[in-house]
Amino acid sequence: MATDLNYIKYVVEQIDLPDISFKKMFGDYMVYYKAVPVLLVCDDCVFVKILKETSELLGEDCEQGFPYDGAKLHYVLDIDNSDLARQTVVAVYNCRKDKPNK
């Protein structure tokens, strides 16, 4: 099942930061902050990479899942908690902004 366009718009509204964009990829979406990929939205569920910074914010008890077959394990972000979602996006951006794209 692909992500609904209304859901990705809701995700962007919840994050409520300037320079947020999204791009459709294989029926699902990648969310970018200042052109840096920060979130993956698959099947109307928001996934964030497991990093030291995201572990500190979300905690070890955060729900985890696989966004698609063959993917690495990710945290499942509670997008209804807009403050936490915003902090998570900024944290991922700060640790990824200087890394070159593959």
Map each language-model feature to its residues:
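Charge-dense, helix-prone N-terminal extensions
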Residues: 1-102
